[in-house]
Swiss-Prot record:
Upper classification of the organism: Bacteria, Pseudomonadati, Thermodesulfobacteriota, Desulfuromonadia, Desulfuromonadales
Protein's name according to its UniProt entry: ATP synthase epsilon chain 1
Species of origin: Syntrophotalea carbinolica (strain DSM 2380 / NBRC 103641 / GraBd1) (Pelobacter carbinolicus)
Job of this protein: Produces ATP from ADP in the presence of a proton gradient across the membrane.
SUPFAM superfamilies xrefs: Epsilon subunit of F1F0-ATP synthase N-terminal domain
Oligomer status and interactors: F-type ATPases have 2 components, CF(1) - the catalytic core - and CF(0) - the membrane proton channel. CF(1) has five subunits: alpha(3), beta(3), gamma(1), delta(1), epsilon(1). CF(0) has three main subunits: a, b and c.
Gene3D superfamilies (alphabetical): ATP synthase delta/epsilon subunit, C-terminal domain, F0F1 ATP synthase delta/epsilon subunit, N-terminal
Length: 138
């Protein structure tokens, strides 16, 4: 059994990272899940949320937006729509987006077409604020 996982994260725009890591935690569509070396093969979907990985005693966080995770032979491939590391999140912009989404949601009902889009925008903003607020490595 390998002692490390090879983590690869890719968006449509770029390769976000390639790292040898000790474990990952991801926001699965059915709930948060973790992967350690020797994990059973897996293919699952991701939702908007906080993705983390640990290298030694350091934990790194990213805000991810929808995607897929494939685990096979101590390799974790993450394909996501967007992924932002802590140091690439503009906290003021994320807070402004949160305010806009909250204000717009107060004007809408669940029957409105835009309602679910605004809920998703709210969730993305909240995750970005959470990840940015980590204040460096965990």
């Amino acid at each position: 059994m390998a002692q490390k996982l090879k983590l690869e994260m890719v968006t449509p725009a770029a390769q976000v990272l390639i790292e040898e890591v000790d474990e990952i935690a991801a926001p699965g569509s059915l709930g948060q899940f973790g992967v350690l070396p020797g994990h059973t093969p897996l293919l699952t979907t991701l939702q908007v949320g906080e993705f983390s990985y640990r290298k030694g005693s350091d934990v790194y966080y990213l805000a991810v937006n929808w995607g897929y995770v494939e685990v096979a032979e101590d390799r974790v491939l993450v394909l996501v729509e967007t992924a932002e590391t802590q140091d690439h999140i503009d906290l003021a912009r994320a807070k402004a987006a949160l305010g806009r989404a909250e204000a717009r949601l107060r004007e809408l009902t669940p029957a409105d077409k835009e309602y679910h889009n605004m809920q998703a925008a709210l969730q993305r903003a909240m995750v970005r604020i959470q990840v940015a607020g980590r204040g460096g490595r965990g």
